Amino acid sequence: MWLGDYSLLNLLGIFLQATFIQNILLSTFLGMCSYLACSSRLSTANGLGMSVALVLTITGSINWLVHYFITKPGALAWLSPALANIDLSFLELIMFIVVIAAFTQILELLLERFSRNLYLALGIFLPLIAVNCAILGGVLFGITRNYPFLPMVVFSLGSGCGWWLAIVLFATIREKLAYSDVPQHLRGTGISFITTGLMAMAFMGLTGIDISKPTTSKPAFVMNIATDSPQPNTHSSSEEPKAS
């Protein structure tokens, strides 16, 4: 339940997969609004990236607990056997969003108290983290892949770090583009989308590499043999003598 068939090496594979190979921004293009709006300065992009990574990691872990102990069909059986047939999965999406919004509000209060400059730099985009589709998408991806708890935490952290990496790289490029001779009709949004597309193509070169599969589980053919009914042995070395 907590680690499943995943080893520590598999956890590293999940992190690298979520960060580079299946980057949540450059492979699924989730969270593009704040990515484009808050990447004009590297310091602002770095602060927003750290915030998204933190929110995604914490809310991914909390929402895993919500899924497996509250909303999953039969999840309430730990309270009472009489509740085993209750299915609250229709509330799952709403509860996920509530958890994300609540933690985002906590983060906003902390930044306002301890990092006033970053709080003012992010502006309206800080509370909009609550509806950042990259965070909800990362949570849903982890839930639908049926990760145990620790792999879910690592996947959420990797997805958040991948989004952070993408916006920091993009902000670095945009600062260079400010001093470049960009054609007039491509300035602004045009060159931003072209740059993002080129970054996505670079990360797409890692497509096909899968290093996140568990390696401690039994091979499928062993389980099949164990579950199949025994077959008669037609190649026995000793045969019954035929009746004369």
Curated annotation (Swiss-Prot):
Query: What's its EC?
Result: 7.2.1.1
Q: Which GO terms describe its molecular function?
A: oxidoreductase activity, acting on NAD(P)H, quinone or similar compound as acceptor
Q: List, alphabetically, the InterPro entries matched.
A: NqrDE/RnfAE (IPR003667), NqrDE/RnfAE_oxidrdctase (IPR050133), NqrE (IPR010967)
Topology of this chain in the membrane:
Multi-pass membrane protein
Q: What keywords are assigned to this protein? A: Cell inner membrane, Cell membrane, Ion transport, Membrane, NAD, Sodium, Sodium transport, Translocase, Transmembrane, Transmembrane helix, Transport, Ubiquinone
Q: Which family does it belong to?
A: Belongs to the NqrDE/RnfAE family.
Which protein, by its recorded name, is this? Na(+)-translocating NADH-quinone reductase subunit E
> Origin organism of this chain?
Chlamydia trachomatis serovar L2 (strain ATCC VR-902B / DSM 19102 / 434/Bu)
